[in-house]
Amino acid sequence: MIAYVESSGLAMMALRQAGHLELQTRLLAFDEQVCQAVGIIELSSAAARWIRRTQPTPQYAQSVRESIEEIWRTTTKHAIDDAQIQRAAGLCERYQLRAYDALHLAAAESLMRIVSSKHMRWFGFDEMQNKAAVAIGLRDGMVD
């Protein structure tokens, strides 16, 4: 089974935010964790913003950076192609999504075509993005 984890889920784990333990527990049931290749940009940006805002100890900030490196190292990167970019543009308009949210959906949808929805679950944490995910046939991994 494949878990497509969009970048806010990865950030949730790296920053140890509310819900990260449930997410990590659910991901244990999957063989592979996948994210769009640009997810590292969002993940790093979220962490940098969090560090600036909360001003943790240098040691804790370093542990967050190390967590990001480990999460990204163990995540399979799904490459962007022109078809995904075009699909994402359409998803932005149809579902009123932010660009990266739509790109994650397009990536997950393209992966679903390869492995089928029976063998893949979507892990997203934005309400509008999740509604769009269900509408295009993705199955929510946070729902039993």
What are these regions (language model features)?
Residues 1, 30-33, 74-76, 116-121:
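Short active-site oxyanion
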Residues 1-40, 50-63, 144:
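Short, well-structured N-terminal submotif of metal-dependent ribonuclease cores
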Residues 2, 106, 110-144:
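Acidic, PIN/NYN-like endoribonuclease modules and their adjacent C-terminal/linker elements
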Residues 8, 44, 48, 89-92, ...:
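Amphipathic alpha-helical segments within well-ordered protein domains
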Residues 14, 18-21, 49-50, 67, ...:
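Noncatalytic, solvent-exposed loop/strand surfaces
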Residues 39-40, 70-95, 102-107:
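Acidic catalytic patch
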Residues 49-81:
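Helix-adjacent hinge/juxtasegments
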